[in-house]
Each structure stands twice: as structure tokens, then as C-alpha cells.
């Protein structure tokens, strides 16, 4: 501060001597004095307003005096004449001086003997070295804070020479005009409108996702781009970055991420959106845009590039043929669907409409059913070329053998059914005639399946295996039924997978069929005789019991 300022603040010459001594001992740092509270408050006002400046206002703009945005913008004016300083100093002052300004900048704190307030307010304050700039005399108490807060910061810093020392008087005149307006308009609210309005302006800062400016009030949104561009050029030599500059970088990053091709169009669109949704006259409303800018810019990209993209909300798909479906079908371009795209299901075409909610077992069952249907459809189509048929369905030969075996088993079961012997013999004769007339049909496959066992064993041996259960059937009726059916199935199923020795197949099959049929007829005849014998035996036992009881009664 200058000597005239100290005299107006009722400081003594002892204070000057102390400052000189402290400068010699401690460099540019000043030790606190009990009588220097007013000076320290003024220095703090100067530092706070210069380090916590959030707006870079254009001088050519004319705003309404009714809004507190315009008052704050006028108060923080004179940014072109400020002294640039280092980035580390600015950051330190932002965090050191800002918490203490509310306690120290109290107009009722006039006690110069209060050592605690002086010591707490004067820590870290820089005193000038060398020449000192002249300043006008101090006005009243209410105007001192405002005037000194908007003064030249070169009074507190002398490390770097100010390039704009010639414009000090002009800036001081502007500050006087601006201060008078602020005091007249804000007398009804609080004595320090800058602090209260700054705190109010910081309240709407709710989220960092929106790229709009958080703490700089936008009075005329039409000139927002010019404000943001002008904020880049205010203090080029200083390492400090203003809030508007940082917020512009955030907005540019969001726009670049969302728009790879049209950066300029989307930046203009972002400002137009904010113009539509922000009202400068509404003091309580936040300057954030209501619409999420990321979603709107993606949709506009789609309109500009004429590309349809698949998102969670859209219903059109492009090039999703790689997604697997049960029937190996794919989507067509521009086709509307109602199910989840990732699963790749069209409920109208798939048999199970709720396949996305089915379990793994249900899905595997459905896949097996579809495969079986495809195999049956391929079977129903006659193919003259056996090679192609085998290539399409490698299990076709085995399936034919299984069908032939099933037909043979059914025939054997019919023979074992309780029918008269004449009808059985007629069935046997019919089967023999069919085998003689159609040796190349199903019986041929049966014979081919039985050729292996017949080639390895003698004919007598096969007949003995077929006739063997007749000896045991005379003892028990139930076992004879089971053994006869088991033997007939055994002679057919044990040789199901053989494909060799086709030359002896017809003869061996005829022999084996005849032996099995004769064995079954003998079994059925023995069953009828056994039942008759059993009935006679039971009748004789009853007669014996009755006679025995009758003799006992006679003896008594």
C-alpha cells in the first residue's frame, strides 16, 4: 500500500519502520501488527477479488441494472489492468485467503487492539518493495472494501513489473463508478454483495456432467461464445486458468467425444440448446441445460450421417446376421423386432416365443426338437444317390436297421400273443411268403444284420439256442413267457451293427426265422398243457383235503 493510504487509515510512522525492518529480515513477508488490521483487510479484499474472479466481461456489453449478474459483472471489471502472477501463487491464494475473507471482512470489526484478528488476517500478506503507486484518498467505510477489492493487484506484488501502469487512473475512475452502483443497489440486502452473490452463484453447481458453465452467470446467451473466447485472452502471461476456460475445455471434450465428424455444428447446437433452457432473469434457476447434451448430439449425428444405429431405445437393426438363432436365421436390414437384440430372437418365427426366459435345459430340448424335425424332413425326401444321403445324414443306415429290427420284434410279439395255433401258423406262412417274395426289403436288412452271427456259428447251434428255453418252459409258465421273448429279441439285437457276409444272409435269415417260430409254437403248446395239469393237480388236492377232514369227523 502507499504512504497516503496508510495515513488515511490512521497508521503511525512506527508502522512504516516496522515494515522496513521486517522486509530486511524476512524478505517480502510482513509480520502482523496489532494496528494493521484495516490495511490487512484491504489487502485481503484485493487478493480475494483478483484470485476468485470467475467472469471475464466485455466492456461493450450493456446489461440491465436490476439483475445481480450485471452488478457482479461490473464489479469484477478491470481485468485487463491486473498484474499477472505465477500459477502457484494464484492457487495458494485461492485456498488460503478465501476461507478467511468472511471472518476478516466484517465492517463492524473496528477494534484495532484485537491481536487475534490482526494475526489471523495478516498471515501470508505480501508487502511492496521499491516504488509504490499513488492512489486516491479513502472514501467512507462501506466504499473502502469495494474500492480496494477492485484496485490494482500490483500494489501487493512487486516481483513482476506491471505492463499497464499508465492506465491506473482510468481504472480507478471506473472502479469508483462501479462501486457506487453496487452500494446503492445492494444496501437492502447485505453489506458485502460480492461475497453473498458469489456464494449464491456457487449453489447451482450440482453435477459435473453437464458441460455448461457452473459459476459464471450468462446474462446474454447470444454472446456466450464470444465470452468464452475472450476469456482465453485476458491474461495470456499468467499461468492461471479461469473457470470459463476450464469449462470450455470440458464442453469441447464432450462435443469431440460425441461428434467425430461435425465439431462446429455440434458446438453451435450446444449453445443454442443452452439459450433455449436458461433464463438470465430467473435468479434461482441454474444455468444447466435441461436436456442431456450427449443423447441429443448422438441423435443429430445419426441424422447428419444418415446412419441407423442400434441402441437400447431404437428398434432397427443393421448387419446383425452374425447373431446365432436356433433355426440359423438372420435379421434383415430395417426389420422391426420386439425382443432383445443381443440374444437374436424373432418371437414371430421361433416356435417358443419366450426363449430368452427359458432355462438351459429347455433351450437344449428345443434345439434337439428342431434338429429332429430337420432330420425327419430330410428322411421324407427320397434320394436316389446313397452317397448324398449318407453325407446329409450319416446315421441313415443305422436308422434303417433299427426300423427293420423293430418290425421283426413286433412280428415276434404278435406270434407270442394268446391266439389259436392255426392263426399262428397262418401268420408264419404269410411271413415266409413275404420273405420269399420280397427278399430285398426289410427282411433283407434283418438278414444283413444277422449275417455275422450265422457266419461265426453253425446252424445247429443257432437252432439249439432258440429251442433251448422249451426245456425250462415245462417247469414254470411265467419264466417260459419271459425267456421266449427274450430269446427272440436277443437273436435280433445282438447282431444289429454287422454289415459283412452278405452272400450267406438270405439262407441264414430263413433258417433263423423258422427256428424261432417253431420254438414259440412249442412254448405255447407246453403252456396250455401245463395249465391243464395244474388245474387237475389242484382239484386232486382239494379232494384229498376234503376227504381227510371227512375221515376226522367220522373218527370223532
From Swiss-Prot:
It comes from the Eukaryota. Residues 227-243 have a biased composition (Polar residues). It comes from Dictyostelium discoideum (Social amoeba). The chain crosses the membrane at residues 528-548. The keyword Transmembrane applies. One of its GO terms (cellular component) is membrane. Residues 1-40, 80-243, 278-324, 363-391, 422-525 are annotated as: Disordered. Residues 7-25, 80-133, 164-181, 207-226, 292-322, 369-388, 425-525 have a biased composition (Low complexity). It is found in: Membrane. The lineage of its organism: Eukaryota, Amoebozoa, Evosea, Eumycetozoa, Dictyostelia. Keywords: Membrane, Transmembrane, Transmembrane helix. The keyword Metal-binding does not apply. This is Uncharacterized protein DDB_G0289357. Residues 30-40, 182-192 have a biased composition (Acidic residues). Coiled coil: none annotated. It is a single-pass membrane protein.
Amino acid at each position: 500500500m502507499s504512504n497516503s493510504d496508510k495515513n488515511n487509515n490512521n497508521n503511525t510512522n512506527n508502522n512504516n519502520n516496522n515494515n522496513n525492518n521486517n522486509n530486511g529480515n524476512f524478505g517480502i513477508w510482513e509480520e502482523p501488527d496489532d494496528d494493521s488490521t484495516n490495511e490487512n483487510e484491504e489487502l485481503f479484499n484485493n487478493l480475494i477479488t483478483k484470485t476468485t474472479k470467475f467472469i471475464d466481461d466485455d466492456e461493450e456489453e450493456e446489461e440491465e441494472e436490476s439483475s445481480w449478474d450485471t452488478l457482479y459483472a461490473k464489479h469484477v471489471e478491470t481485468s485487463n489492468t491486473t498484474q499477472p502472477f505465477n500459477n502457484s501463487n494464484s492457487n495458494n491464494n485461492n485456498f488460503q485467503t478465501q476461507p478467511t475473507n468472511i471472518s476478516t471482512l466484517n465492517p463492524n470489526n473496528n477494534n484495532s487492539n484485537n491481536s487475534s484478528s490482526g494475526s489471523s488476517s495478516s498471515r501470508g500478506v505480501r508487502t511492496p518493495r521499491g516504488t509504490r503507486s499513488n492512489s486516491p484518498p479513502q472514501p467512507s467505510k462501506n466504499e473502502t472494501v469495494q474500492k480496494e477489492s477492485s484496485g490494482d493487484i500490483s500494489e501487493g506484488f512487486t516481483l513482476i513489473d506491471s505492463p499497464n501502469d499508465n492506465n491506473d487512473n482510468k481504472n480507478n475512475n471506473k472502479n469508483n463508478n462501479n462501486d457506487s452502483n453496487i452500494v446503492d443497489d445492494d444496501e437492502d440486502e447485505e453489506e458485502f454483495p460480492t461475497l453473498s452473490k458469489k456464494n449464491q452463484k456457487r449453489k447451482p453447481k450440482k453435477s459435473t456432467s453437464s458441460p455448461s458453465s457452473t459459476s459464471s452467470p450468462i446474462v446474454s446467451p447470444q454472446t456466450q461464445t464470444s465470452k468464452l473466447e475472450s476469456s482465453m485472452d485476458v491474461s495470456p502471461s499468467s499461468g492461471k486458468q479461469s473457470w470459463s476456460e476450464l469449462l470450455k475445455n470440458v464442453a469441447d471434450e464432450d462435443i469431440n467425444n460425441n461428434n467425430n465428424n461435425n465439431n462446429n455444428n455440434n458446438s453451435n447446437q450446444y449453445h443454442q440448446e443452452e439459450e433455449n433452457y436458461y433464463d438470465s432473469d430467473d435468479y434461482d434457476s441454474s444455468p444447466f441445460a435441461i436436456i442431456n447434451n450427449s443423447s441429443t448430439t448422438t441423435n443429430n449425428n445419426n441424422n447428419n450421417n444418415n446412419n441407423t444405429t442400434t441402441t437400447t431405445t431404437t428398434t432397427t437393426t443393421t448387419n446383425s446376421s452374425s447373431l446365432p438363432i436356433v433355426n440359423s436365421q438372420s435379421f434383415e436390414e430395417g426389420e422391426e423386432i420386439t425382443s432383445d437384440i443381443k440374444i437374436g430372437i424373432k418371437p414371430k418365427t421361433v416356435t417358443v416365443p419366450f426363449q430368452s426366459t427359458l432355462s438351459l435345459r429347455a433351450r437344449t430340448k428345443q434345439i434337439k426338437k428342431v434338429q429332429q424335425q430337420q432330420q425327419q424332413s430330410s428322411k421324407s425326401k427320397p434320394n436316389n444317390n446313397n452317397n448324398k444321403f449318407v453325407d446329409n445324414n450319416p446315421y441313415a443306415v443305422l436308422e434303417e436297421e433299427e426300423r427293420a429290427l423293430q418290425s421283426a420284434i413286433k412280428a415276434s410279439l404278435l406270434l407270442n400273443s394268446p391266439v389259436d395255433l392255426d392263426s399262428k401258423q397262418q401268420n408264419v406262412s404269410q411271413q415266409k411268403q413275404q420273405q420269399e417274395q420280397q427278399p430285398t426289403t426289410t427282411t433283407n436288412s434283418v438278414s444283413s444284420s444277422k449275417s455275422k452271427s450265422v457266419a461265426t456259428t453253425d446252424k445247429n447251434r443257432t437252432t439249439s439256442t432258440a429251442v433251448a428255453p422249451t426245456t425250462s418252459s415245462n417247469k414254470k409258465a411265467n419264466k417260459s413267457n419271459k425267456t421266449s421273448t427274450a430269446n427272440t429279441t436277443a437273436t435280433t439285437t445282438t447282431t444289429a451293427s454287422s454289415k459283412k457276409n452278405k452272400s450267406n444272409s438270405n439262407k441264414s435269415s430263413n433258417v433263423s426265422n423258422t427256428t424261432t417260430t417253431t420254438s414259440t409254437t412249442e412254448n405255447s403248446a407246453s403252456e396250455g398243457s401245463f395249465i391243464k395239469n395244474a388245474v387237475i393237480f389242484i382239484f386232486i388236492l382239494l379232494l384229498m383235503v376234503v376227504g381227510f377232514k371227512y375221515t376226522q369227523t367220522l373218527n370223532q
